[in-house]
C-alpha cells in the first residue's frame, strides 16, 4: 500500500521529469549554458581560455559563497513556527503579540552555542543562544537571550575581553582554561554564571530540551505611557534534559551536530517542540528596594519574589528549506523593538543594542534588513536608500522625493509611538563607575545551596576538571575564594579537590 508520503515523493519525481526538459541551465544573467562539463580550451589538451565566461562566473561565485561567520554564536540552527498568546497583556504593553488571547504571531528561532566556530561540536560546555524573532504587524520584534538566565559580566565594555578568553588562544589556536579562569578570577561578578554553567545545565541534551531567558530586563509601556520592567522566560514543554561530560564525549565522537539533527528530526516527525513564555514584573519605583540591582544581568529574578506569569506558547513546526537563506542569513538583534517594548538601563544590554546591528552589517551588508528572512510583514516606509543590493528606492511613492518632510508626500511619524517619558533612577550626571549594588556572591551561594547532593558533586567535578588544567596556583586560589565567599562548603570542596588546605581560605 502506497503511503501518503510515498505518493508525494512520486508526484515530485514525476513533476521533475515532466518539467526537466523545459529547465535550461543558464548563467547568472540568464544566458543559456551549452556545456557545464568541459571548459573552453586551446585544442583538446590545451590551456583553458580566459574567455570562458561561464567558467569564470562559476568559480567566482564559488569563491564568494562564504560570508563572515558570527563572531559569537557561530554554531547554530533554526526553525520556524508561531507564538499563540494565552493572556491579554494590554494593561502593561502595546506590543501587538501580547494584546489578545488566541492571537498567533509567526516566529523564527535560532539556537546556538557561544564560543566556538560554525563547524564545532554541539556538546561543548557553553551557554546556548535562544533568539526568537516575532513577525508582527508593527515590525519585527526580537527576544535575543540564552538558555541560562544570567551572564558573566554586567558592562559591555568587558565583552570583547571576555569573548577573547573563551575563544582559542591566538598562539596555540586552542581553547585554554588558563585564559578564561584568569579572567574570571579577577571578575567576581562572574561567580554566579560560572556556577550555573558548570552544573549539568552547562551541556543541554538538545535545543528542544532547554529553557530560555531574555537575560536582561526590558520595559513594557502601555497606551497610557505607564512603564513596568520585566524579564522573559521560556519554559520547555519537552522537559529540561542535560548531558554528563561522559555522555557528551560519547556523542561528540560520533556526531558533532547532534542537537541540530535532533531538532530537525523531531519537526520532520511532527513532534513539534513547544515552549511556554512567562514574564516577571518590577515596578520602576521598586527598583531600589532589593539587595541587588535588578537591571544587572549577572542577577536572577527569583520566581518566589517575582512570580512567573504565563502569556503564551511557542510552537516550532517548520524546518529551514535553505539553511543559508533562512538561518545563516537571519539577523537577530535586541534592538529590534516594537511599540510597547523599550530597552532598560542594563549596561550590558545598552552595548548589545549597538553591537548586534553592527555585526549584522559586517556579516550581511548594510541592507541586511532586506534579506527575505529579515523582512517585516508590514510595509517599510522610510528614505534610507542605496548601498549594496538595495531595493528600497523602487518602493518610494515618488522616486524624486527621497527626503522628509516634503510638501509633495505627506509621510509623517506618528506621535503615539514616541518612547515613554520616565524619571530615571539615577541623577542626571555623567559617571564612569561600577553599579552601586554589586552583591557578587549572594545569588551564587543561593543557587549552590538549591542544588541536590548529586548536582553539587557534578558541579565540583566539572569545575575541578577545568581548574586542574590551570597552571597558576594564584588563579586557582582566587577562584576558590570566589566560591568560598558564595558558600563556605562550595569553596572548601573545590579547594580540597585541588589539593589546597582549608587554612588557606580562612
Predicted features along the sequence, with ranges:
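Generic low-polarity alpha-helical segments
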Residues: 1, 18-21
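Bacterial N-terminal signal peptides
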Residues: 9-19
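Active-site-adjacent core segments of small-molecule enzymes
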Residues: 23-506
